[in-house]
Amino acid sequence: MLNRSLLVDGVNEIFVVTTRISLVTFLLTIYCAKEFFSEINKEYFLKGTLTGFLAITIPGWTFIYALKSISSGLQSIFISTIPMFTVFWVFLVYKEEKITRLKVISVFIGLSGLILLFASGATGLSNDGDLVTGGLLALIGVQGLALSNITNKKDSQYIPARTYLLAQWIASTVFSLILFYILGGEVEILNRSQALRLSGLVFIDIFNYSLFFYTIKRLSATFTTLVDYVVPIVGIYVGYIFLDEVINNIFFVTLFFIFISLYLAVKDEARSLD
């Protein structure tokens, strides 16, 4: 919602995403620098670079461009599919985590909801928007996050936490600055309200990423992402209240399928933990 409110105010998306990622990196450097410089090596940095590209660069850039075509509420629905796609990618590339028949069924149920959503063409915007463009961009970002859940899970077992965390953000800052230059980004002067919202995004990023990084070391990649199912309910109504976004009935139909998918995934995960 904060991202889209800045776009609505006319702040350039290239500036928003580059500044947000750069500020997070600056603050994390203050906190992690000592451990980072004492522990970093080529292997750790390369692994951090890959995960940072998947977890930060890809979703950071695709999500903000998606918001030019779909509502923040609709984007939150796409974000809620991260656990579903995590199951998919775990099945393909991460053999250490068991994927049961019930989890596979949950993925197909969630995909059915997405198919219905795309068939509707609803964007959540009063000026129509473009579901194909916005939806595909959002899904690309989701794939990056789903894959990063797997690399985070594998690498965080032996790479020191602060070293791994800062390597990801440093790499993402470099990628973003390169994109800023290539895409012709320009530095903008923000008013007080815009600066506060951008600062809010920065601190939300730090909190969310730190919490995720703590849980991924202790729980499975699939279970860690289940919190993403809470996002759409809040996102839809916050966008409706503060940004005058449109709530379409198909959103709730899609969420129904996604929540069934959630129930099956949680049931299976709880069984495996027992």
Q: Which functions belong to the PLM regions below?
A:
Residues 28, 89, 101-121, 176, ...:
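Hydrophobic transmembrane alpha-helices of multi-pass small-molecule transport proteins
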Residues 48-52, 64, 76, 107, ...:
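Residue-level signature of transmembrane alpha-helical cores of multipass secondary-active transporters
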Residues 6, 16, 66, 78, ...:
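Hydrophobic/aromatic residues within transmembrane alpha-helices
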Residues 43-51, 99-111, 159-167:
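Cytoplasmic-side transmembrane-helix entry/capping segments in multi-pass membrane proteins
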Residues 1, 28, 86-92, 124-183, ...:
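Transmembrane alpha-helical segments that form core, pore/gating elements
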Residues 29-75, 79, 115-116, 201-219:
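Specific transmembrane alpha-helical segments of multi-pass solute transporters/efflux pumps
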Residues 18-19, 56, 60, 75-81, ...:
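Helix-helix packing/entry segments at the starts of transmembrane helices
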Residues 9-18, 40-45, 119-144, 181-199, ...:
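Juxtamembrane helix-entry segments on the extracytoplasmic side of multipass membrane proteins
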